[in-house]
Amino acid sequence: MKVLYDTILKAKYTGRPNRFVVTLDLNGESVLAHLPNPGRMWELLFTGVTMYIVPHDKPDAKTKYRVVGIERNGVVIMLDTNYSNDVAQHLIENKLIPGWEEWRVVRREYTVKLHGTSSRFDLLLTNDKGHEFLLEVKSCTLFSKTGAMFPDAITERGRKHLLHLKELQNEGYHTGVLFLVQWDKAVSYTHLTLPTN
């Protein structure tokens, strides 16, 4: 697997002014960092928790740093959702998902339109029989002691994707959702139904 970051720094979490920005203590200096994961992460974001950041690669970025991970009980959890598709593609190409050995990735960010509804899915897979498999990749960062749960926040976009996947399945497509559970102690998974208000 490729090296994702040249330089990784450790900082301490101090606050979250909005869904996409956190304040951190970096060696005594207060800094802002972009948080690419908009989930609630209530079980992860505690004052003083160690976060892993990298210098922002975009010169016009609003923050100097970008969050890539967080530590929980000595385990580093990847929060950089920009790389979720890379991880999924690595797992598929190296045949590390039992039952998916016949599939290979042919496109990323693939848009499908059906009955006037258009959705962009993370990966388009194919096999030697020419079948297509539309895959949505979700990064799961909500955990109990031994369980993984998803989602940790209401997402209309995510709901739309799942409903569209179901419609496409009814039209004959192979469809699926791959949950990247980043908690090695998880032995079970629960889909949460969140209140809409």
Question: Can you annotate each of these PLM segments?
Answer:
Residues 190-196:
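Conserved small/polar residues in nucleotide/adenosyl-binding loops
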Residues 61-73:
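OB-fold/S1-family single-stranded nucleic acid-binding modules
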Residues 11, 121-152, 165:
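Conserved catalytic cores of phosphodiester-cleaving nucleases, focusing on short active-site segments
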Residues 40-51:
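Short nucleic-acid-contacting surface segments enriched for D/E, G, S/T with interspersed K/R
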Residues 31-42:
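Beta-strand/loop nucleic-acid-binding surfaces
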Residues 19-23:
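Short aromatic-glycine-enriched beta-strand elements
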Residues 55-60:
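Short, charged beta-turn/beta-strand-edge "cap" motif at the junction between a beta-strand
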Residues 97-115:
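A short acidic/basic microdomain associated with nuclease active sites
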